């Protein structure tokens, strides 16, 4: 059995987990998340702790018990604390502005780039060169951060572009005569 799958997931106060045959629902202060339950994994809620057991001894069932445990742990963490990604804009004239559910970027193109945020995701710009993407669903927050970064990834010679705040960009040396 997967070592990750053997660990129990503690459900904190204020988080409600309901398990049907094919759907796991996690409700908390930051929203509700749904995930289909895998057919090879049995999920049980025992006194505020979730356990994940494979239904047979196949390698797929063992692997999926660990995967389901990690995904549900992220759901529980997301609806109680939430997830966030911080992006930095590096470059002359590069600016970001949050307008409700839209992110307006001026990143060196002839036109502003506008990114619409889905429901359940909050975007903030503490300064003109910082973007904070917050939400309960870890996968959606990470995917949106990657999509925003893809508009202008950091280039290797000067480091200009959009990067994660903790990302280190390796700067190349220019060609010498």
Curated annotation (Swiss-Prot):
Query: Cross-referenced SUPFAM superfamilies, in alphabetical order?
Result: Ribosomal protein L6
Provide this UniProt record's keywords sorted from A to Z.
Answer: Ribonucleoprotein, Ribosomal protein, RNA-binding, rRNA-binding
What would be one Pfam family of this protein? Ribosomal_L6
Biological processes annotated in GO: cytoplasmic translation
Under the heading PANTHER family, the entry gives: 60S/50S RIBOSOMAL PROTEIN L6/L9, LARGE RIBOSOMAL SUBUNIT PROTEIN UL6M
Question: What function does this protein fulfil?
Answer: This protein binds to the 23S rRNA, and is important in its secondary structure. It is located near the subunit interface in the base of the L7/L12 stalk, and near the tRNA binding site of the peptidyltransferase center.
- Which protein family is named in the record? Belongs to the universal ribosomal protein uL6 family.
Assembly: Part of the 50S ribosomal subunit.
Q: What is this protein called?
A: Large ribosomal subunit protein uL6
* Species the sequence originates in: Leptothrix cholodnii (strain ATCC 51168 / LMG 8142 / SP-6) (Leptothrix discophora (strain SP-6))
């Amino acid at each position: 059995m997967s070592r990750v799958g053997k660990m129990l997931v503690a459900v904190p106060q204020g988080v409600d987990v309901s398990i049907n045959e094919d759907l796991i629902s996690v409700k908390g202060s930051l929203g509700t998340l749904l995930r289909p339950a895998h057919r090879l994994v049995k999920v049980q809620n025992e006194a505020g702790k979730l356990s994940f057991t494979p239904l047979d001894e196949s390698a797929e069932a063992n692997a999926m018990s660990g995967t389901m445990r990690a995904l549900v742990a992220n759901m529980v963490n997301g609806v109680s604390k939430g997830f966030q990604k911080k992006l930095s804009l590096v470059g002359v004239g590069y600016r970001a502005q949050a307008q409700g559910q839209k992110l307006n970027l001026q990143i060196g193109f002839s036109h502003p780039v506008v990114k619409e945020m889905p429901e359940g995701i909050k975007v903030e710009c503490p300064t003109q060169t910082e973007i904070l993407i917050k939400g309960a669903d870890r996968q959606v927050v990470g995917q949106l951060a990657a999509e925003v970064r893809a508009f202008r990834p950091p280039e290797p010679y000067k480091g200009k572009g959009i990067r994660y705040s903790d990302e280190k960009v390796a700067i190349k040396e220019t060609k010498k005569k």
